């Protein structure tokens, strides 16, 4: 990129400089010249420290690799291994007990347990849908998914034709009544028997027939209503475990007319928080890509992001939802609730650089430092409302919420805290305005989690287990120890069970309850919602105040779990427990015996992973899609991002390193699976098949490189190869 602006010691891409100066800075109160001088100072000062931290990662990995190679024929001695990790500084002393001091945090983080969406910031439509997913129709979520089986005449009708299957609709209504019975039980009888609702002297009454009415078992669960009493269209607002439920009443509507109580929908407070992602779910490899993400982030914070959407043959403009206003039960006051999810922004980690900013010698500067500066500047608009900042606020407490991924240990968390402090100085923000969400997704952070939290104890607003990346790091860290177990077995290994408990226990021990989120990972099968409803309740039962979901519909369905589980009570019960032992966390997931694998087992593992890798990489390289719903080898749609890619590529790289498989077998597996992926993408007009010209297909070559060179990638990360290959593709396409 030749069109650059000199900023002190730096050279900034013109597209970025113009966007920040002309679009992002106005309305923030930050002087443009002072800001760019601050950028120059922060980047110049902190880039060398960033590089030192990456060198420390490499040095530790080299020492761990050497230790395992020297003991290749010996059984692993757990005590000696732990001593070694302590000696080299991989394990650090655990700090004395402490309590985090994070202040000025929104209720969505401190007190309300509920689902958390993660969405790629480069896609404006996805970002708008996610921000608006604070409230979701339970009827739509049930009708449109497999939670209601398509049996006994309950098949879905086509939304495009306006069809509606009343048999299925009746099952949806019955399911929703069961939800109400569990979340807001009546003093007598069941919501299933309701034939009407009314408000009398500030109390909600539910008519059950024969002129009999009953109230709620807990009358305080009725907190508001909309509409005018006595009119046909109105709604009732309930609350349970801090989450709201709106019962919409309209006996003249198509659905309400089939309901004996006139209820047309039950709307659940769903995605309480949403992470707008600049990291694993996006493919941003240059200044133009970054500016696209920054511009969408600006639109979200100013409240003016919009997108033309076509649905059911109609086109409309999607915008951010307004707040929701209810009348209090006594009819005298108002209750205003947020209409949108509280937004976090996930910056990239410490590893990657980006050509948006280079130094005088042309060296790219750390992308994580750039993200911290620019996403924080933009988020100032979300702290204010007015003519220059837009009508909507994000935080009501004056905080900016940044998720920082892929940090290795306390010293990297401390560096992030230092970076955030420097950014606050540049922007003129009070200390600790920038809050941090710590992803517990790297092994060195897991085993030193208490110290990592303490390193940002006045900023931390969440810790979250990211078991996908964490598995990738588990494999790479112990690459030389021996062949790892198969991917499907990994979730039942001792380390991962201890990891999930350890995260909750450490968070509670550091006083996160009531101050910060304790989160758990993603449901990766977006079409299998019945399975999610059956299984994901385990996360709040384990003490998680939030957990990741792949779609607004999934957020609405996962919200059911927080009505069923009182997470505050669970956390009170778990407080003070230490269920996970360090020995378990350090248990390497080696295969019990490679000799138990048949040739068919090995081929199946090769094919499964090659198909997963190709299915994700081809869209990343060719289309710049960072998060895909990729069919697996059995055509089950799975959410894939760089974390799942890291696992698949690292597992095959590990097996290659230990001669479980050969390079030829890997290449043959990729060539077998490429036509499968081509077939699965046949309906995509923009898709370019990989077969049969494998040698000239950049995506195919990237997938091969990720496996064959996997053991030499920094911590097993896929970004360096993906970014280089995507740039190669973009350059070729531009010719």
UniProtKB/Swiss-Prot annotation:
How is this protein annotated for GO cellular component? cytosol
Q: Catalyses which reaction?
A: glyoxylate + acetyl-CoA + H2O = (S)-malate + CoA + H(+)
Which one GO biological process term can you cite for this protein? Answer: tricarboxylic acid cycle
Q: Which residues bind glyoxylate?
A: 346, 441, 466-469
What keywords tag this UniProt record?
Cytoplasm, Glyoxylate bypass, Magnesium, Metal-binding, Oxidation, Transferase, Tricarboxylic acid cycle
Major subcellular site = cytoplasm
Cofactor(s) for this UniProt protein: Mg(2+)
Where Mg(2+) is bound, by residue?
A: 441, 469
Q: Which residues form the active site?
A: 346, 641
Q: Where does acetyl-CoA bind?
A: 118, 125-126, 281, 318, 550
Positions of post-translational Cysteine sulfenic acid (-SOH) modification: 627
Q: In which pathway does it act?
A: Carbohydrate metabolism; glyoxylate cycle; (S)-malate from isocitrate: step 2/2
Where it sits in the cell: the answer is: Cytoplasm
Q: Which E.C. number(s) belong to this protein? A: 2.3.3.9
What is a single molecular function from GO for this protein? malate synthase activity
- Family of this protein: Belongs to the malate synthase family. GlcB subfamily.
Subunit and interaction comment: Monomer.
Could you tell me what this protein does? Involved in the glycolate utilization. Catalyzes the condensation and subsequent hydrolysis of acetyl-coenzyme A (acetyl-CoA) and glyoxylate to form malate and CoA.
Q: What is this protein called?
A: Malate synthase G
* Originating species: Mycobacteroides abscessus (strain ATCC 19977 / DSM 44196 / CCUG 20993 / CIP 104536 / JCM 13569 / NCTC 13031 / TMC 1543 / L948) (Mycobacterium abscessus)
């Amino acid at each position: 990129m030749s069109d650059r602006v000199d900023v002190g010691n730096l050279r900034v891409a013109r597209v970025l400089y113009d966007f920040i100066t002309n679009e992002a800075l106005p309305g923030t109160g930050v002087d443009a010249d002072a800001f760019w001088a601050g950028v120059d100072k922060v980047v110049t000062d902190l880039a060398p420290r960033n590089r030192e931290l990456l060198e420390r990662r490499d040095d530790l990995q080299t020492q761990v690799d050497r230790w395992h190679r020297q003991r290749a024929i010996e059984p692993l001695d757990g005590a000696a291994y732990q001593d070694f990790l302590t000696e080299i500084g991989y394990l650090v002393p655990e700090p004395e007990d402490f309590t985090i001091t994070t202040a000025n945090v929104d209720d969505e983080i401190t007190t309300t347990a509920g689902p958390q969406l993660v969405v790629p910031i480069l896609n404006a439509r996805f970002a708008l849908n996610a921000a608006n997913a604070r409230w979701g129709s339970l009827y739509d979520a049930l009708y449109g998914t497999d939670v209601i089986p398509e049996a006994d005449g309950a098949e879905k009708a086509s939304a495009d034709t306006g069809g509606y299957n009343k048999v299925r609709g009746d099952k949806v209504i019955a399911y929703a009544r069961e939800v109400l019975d569990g979340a807001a039980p009546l003093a007598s009888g069941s919501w299933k028997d309701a034939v009407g609702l009314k408000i009398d002297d500030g109390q909600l009454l539910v008519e059950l027939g024969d002129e009999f009415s009953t109230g709620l078992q807990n009358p305080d669960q009725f907190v508001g209503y909309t509409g005018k009493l006595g009119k046909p269209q109105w709604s009732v607002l309930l609350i349970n475990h801090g989450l709201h439920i709106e019962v919409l009443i309209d006996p003249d509507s198509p659905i309400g007319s089939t309901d004996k109580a006139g209820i047309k929908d039950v709307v659940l407070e769903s995605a309480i928080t949403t992470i707008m992602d600049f990291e694993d779910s996006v493919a941003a490899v240059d200044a133009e890509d970054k500016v696209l993400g920054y511009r969408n982030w600006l639109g979200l914070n100013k409240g003016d992001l919009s997108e033309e959407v076509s649905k059911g043959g109609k086109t409309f403009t999607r915008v951010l939802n307004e707040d929701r206003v209810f009348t209090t039960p006594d009819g005298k006051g108002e209750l205003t609730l947020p209409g949108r999810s509280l937004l976090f922004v996930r910056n990239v980690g410490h590893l990657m650089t980006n050509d948006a900013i280079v130094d005088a010698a042309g060296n790219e500067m750390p992308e994580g430092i750039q993200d911290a500066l620019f996403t924080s500047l933009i988020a100032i608009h979300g702290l204010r409302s007015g003519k220059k900042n837009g009508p909507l606020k994000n935080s009501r407490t004056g905080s900016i919420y940044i998720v920082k991924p892929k940090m290795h240990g306390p010293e990297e968390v401390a560096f992030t805290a230092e970076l955030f402090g420097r950014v606050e100085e540049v922007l003129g923000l009070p200390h600790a305005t920038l809050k941090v969400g710590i992803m517990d997704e790297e092994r060195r952070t897991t085993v030193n989690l208490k110290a990592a939290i303490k390193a940002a104890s006045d900023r931390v607003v969440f810790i979250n287990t990211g078991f996908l990346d964490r598995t990738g790091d588990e494999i790479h860290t112990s690459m030389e120890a021996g062949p790892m177990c198969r991917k499907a077995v990994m979730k039942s290994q001792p380390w991962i069970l201890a990891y999930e408990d350890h995260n909750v226990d450490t968070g509670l021990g550091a006083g996160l309850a009531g101050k910060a989120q304790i989160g758990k990972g993603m449901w990766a099968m977006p079409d299998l919602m019945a399975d999610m409803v059956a299984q994901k309740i385990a996360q709040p039962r384990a003490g998680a105040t939030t957990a990741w979901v792949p779609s607004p519909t999934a957020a609405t369905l996962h919200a059911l779990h927080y009505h069923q589980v009182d997470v505050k009570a669970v956390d009170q019960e778990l407080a003070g427990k230490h269920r996970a032992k360090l020995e378990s966390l350090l248990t390497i997931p080696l295969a019990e015996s490679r000799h138990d694998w048949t040739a068919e087992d090995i081929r199946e593992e090769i094919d499964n992973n090659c198909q997963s890798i190709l299915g994700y990489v081809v869209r990343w390289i060719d289309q710049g899609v960072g998060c895909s719903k990729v069919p697996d080898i059995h055509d089950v749609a799975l959410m894939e991002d760089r974390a799942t890619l890291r696992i698949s590529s690292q597992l095959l790289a590990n097996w290659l390193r230990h001669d479980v498989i050969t390079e030829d077998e890997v290449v043959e597996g990729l060539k077998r699976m490429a036509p499968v992926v081509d077939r699965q993408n046949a309906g995509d007009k923009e898709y370019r098949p990989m077969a049969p010209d494998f040698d000239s297909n950049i995506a195919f070559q990237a997938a091969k490189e990720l496996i064959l060179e996997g053991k030499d990638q920094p911590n097993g990360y896929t970004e360096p190869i993906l970014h280089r290959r995507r740039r190669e593709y973009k350059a070729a396409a531009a010719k």
